[in-house]
Structures are given as C-alpha cells and as structure tokens.
From Swiss-Prot:
PANTHER family cross-referenced by the UniProt entry: EPOXIDE HYDROLASE (PTHR43329)
This enzyme's EC code(s): 3.3.2.10
Reactions catalysed according to its record: an epoxide + H2O = an ethanediol; (R)-styrene oxide + H2O = (R)-styrene glycol; (S)-styrene oxide + H2O = (S)-styrene glycol; 3,4-epoxy-1-cyclohexene + H2O = cyclohex-3-ene-1,2-diol
UniProt name for this protein: Epoxide hydrolase
Keywords on record: Hydrolase
Pfam family, one: Abhydrolase_1
Similarity annotation: Belongs to the AB hydrolase superfamily. Epoxide hydrolase family.
Subunit structure: Homodimer.
Described purpose of this protein according to its UniProt entry: Catalyzes the hydrolysis of various epoxides into diols. In vitro, shows the strongest activity toward aromatic and cyclic aliphatic epoxide compounds, since it shows strong activity toward (R)-styrene oxide, (S)-styrene oxide, and 3,4-epoxy-1-cyclohexene, but very weak activity toward (R)-epichlorohydrin, (S)-epichlorohydrin, and 1,2-epoxy-9-decene.
SUPFAM superfamilies hit by this protein: alpha/beta-Hydrolases
Organism annotation: Caballeronia sordidicola (Burkholderia sordidicola)
Active site: 111 (nucleophile), 242 (proton donor), 303 (proton acceptor)
Length: 329
C-alpha cells in the first residue's frame, strides 16, 4: 500500500491524500483527531457530500475519513462493472484502514454508501464496530434478487434500476449541469407531492431537469462541485454499481440470512421514494439488525437527508458515536 499526502498544509483542519490499495487509488478527505469514523457516499456523489457531518464530528473529538468511492471523483474508476461489488468496496475500506493503521472504525453511509457500509459491517465485524445508515436500510439476503422479483411481477419496464443499467445510461446522465440538479431536486422532499421521484414510475424518473433554482439546502458550492466532478469523470463508474448488483446476488449466497449484530442507527426521509421498495419501520429493520439502537424518520425530507436536514443528521450522528463509545468501552 502507498500513502501519498496531497497537501503541504491543512486548511481548516481538513487534509486530502491518495492511498493505493486493493488494486486502485482512493482519494481521501480527512478532518479531526480521535476515534475513526469512515464515511461512504452514494450515487451520484463524492466525499464532499459529507463536509457538514465531518466538521460536526471533528469538532466533537472524532477523526472523520471520507474517500471518493471507487468509480467517483479523484479515485480510480475501473471500466469493468464486475469490479464494483460489495466484495470490492469492503476490500477498499479495509485497505484504507490498514494504510492508516486504524484497527477499527464506525461506518457512516448514504444511498449506495449505506449498502457499502452495511455489507462491510456484515463481512468484517472485527474491523467495523458500528454502522450509521442513511436512506437505504439493511435487508438480509433472501431467495431472489430485486431484479428477479421485478421481472416476476411484470415491473421490469418500470423499475428504475433497469434504467440505470441500460446500454445508453452513461449518455442519459452525461449532461451533469442538468442531471445533478435534477436528481437533487426530484429525489428530495422539496419536490411537489405526486411529482417526486418514484422508483416504480418512469414518468417520475431521476432524469428530469429541475424546474428552477434549487432549494437553499442544496448549497451552491456543493452543487457546483458535483457538476464539475461529473463533467470531468462522466457517470460510468457510478453506474457500474447498478450493473454489478444482480451478478453480485449470486456471489452473496454465503451471507444468506446473515445479520449485522454491531450497534446501528438508521435515518430516512419521510418523502424518500425508496420507501416504495424497502421496509422502513424499526421493527422490520431489527429482523436483520439485532443491534439497532434506534432510528429517525424526518418529515418534509426526501432522499438527501445529509443535506436536507444537515444539522439534525449531524446531531444524531454525534449522539450515536458517543453512545457507541459508552457501550463498547
């Protein structure tokens, strides 16, 4: 493994560096000192999505570490979709901890990043001592994949993941100046009821242009950053996670029925379109998360909880970290 510090100084306690591990290079942003907290972003995003939460936990005495996940930002982006399974992302995260000589960390994940976090905790409970998930809950591996279930129910023409793996998906997303504001708006709680993104209705897709300026929670510097990054990289790497999802289901057979026993917490938006797909009650979640310490549904919030309710998410995260410290000490 190689560690290459990309900054000669630290501005506002934030530093960036590259780590070569697991066959790729990860670009990492870090802030603070103390027990390690590892942040995993989703689609279409970069580590910059976490800047508010990173600042909050660094101020509370924790070490916030956020990579651009493989396929995104300034990290490597293999073209081969088979290299984007949870086996690969868990390997990336373990390699990151090893390079930084960190024995264990708490995971925080949003969207696909929540999937990465849940799976890493499932596969390596010795290295990941707790999980704080946003927007995508953990569901134990069952008998069939979501793709199979959608085909069997005749919803293959409606289900959004089939759109994400179309041969022309890269081109559909390519105009980042349109698609980045669009997904932020339509998947949020700010979009009008009945028009918000639905994963099962193609007329309410993620591809629609935003109707006007974004709400204030979508901070201009964050939106501009994402537009610039995806103009530079394209969307192929991020879309590869969707392409890898169905093939990985077969590989995940060893974890059929397996549960995550570490302490966990889950936050979701009441207006998140993913509620059409996943169980969003604490009772249902505890079937796979016996260590679930609680959860929170946020009113008037959609998929982008770390932005739409930034202060609340940061407060809940710091509270969870302190509770985990007390429980595991």
């Amino acid at each position: 493994m190689e560690f290459n510090d990309m900054t000669s100084d630290i501005t506002g306690g934030v530093k960036e560096y590259d780590i070569a591990t697991n066959g790729i290079s990860l670009h990492v942003t870090e802030q603070g000192a103390g027990p390690a907290v590892l942040f995993c972003h989703g689609f279409p995003d970069t580590s910059y999505t976490w800047r508010r939460q990173m600042n909050a936990i660094a101020s509370a005495g924790y070490r916030a570490i956020a990579p651009d996940m493989r396929g995104y930002g300034r990290s490597s982006a293999p073209a081969d979709a088979s290299l984007y399974t949870p086996l690969h992302t868990t390997g990336d995260l373990i390699g990151l901890l090893d390079a930084l000589k960190i024995s264990s960390a708490v995971l925080v994940g949003h969207d696909w990043g929540a999937t990465h976090a849940w799976n890493a905790a499932l596969m390596r409970p010795d290295r990941f001592k707790a999980v704080f998930g946003l927007s995508v809950p953990f569901v134990t591996r069952g008998e069939s994949s979501v793709f199979e279930r959608m085909r069997e129910s005749g919803r293959q023409d409606d289900f959004y993941m089939f759109e994400q793996i179309r041969p022309d998906a890269d081109q559909i997303w390519a105009d980042a100046a349109v698609t980045i504001p669009g997904i932020l708006y339509w998947a949020s709680g700010s979009a009008p009821e009945g028009e918000q993104w639905s994963p099962l209705d193609r007329t309410r897709s993620l591809y629609r242009a935003a109707p006007g300026p974004l709400p204030s929670w979508a901070e201009a510097d964050y939106v501009a950053h994402n537009i610039a990054e995806f103009r530079r990289t394209g969307f192929h790497g991020g879309l590869n996670y969707y392409r890898a999802a169905e093939p990985y289901f077969t590989l995940s057979a060893p974890w059929k029925g397996a549960k995550i026993t570490q302490p966990s917490f889950f936050i979701w938006g009441k207006s998140d379109g993913l509620k059409e797909l996943y169980p969003f009650t604490l009772q249902q979640m505890r079937a796979g998360l016996p260590g679930l310490m609680g959860g929170l549904e946020l009113d008037n919030v959609g998929h982008w909880v770390q932005h739409e309710a930034s202060a609340e998410v940061s407060e809940q995260l710091v509270r969870f970290l302190r509770t985990v410290d007390a429980v595991l000490s």
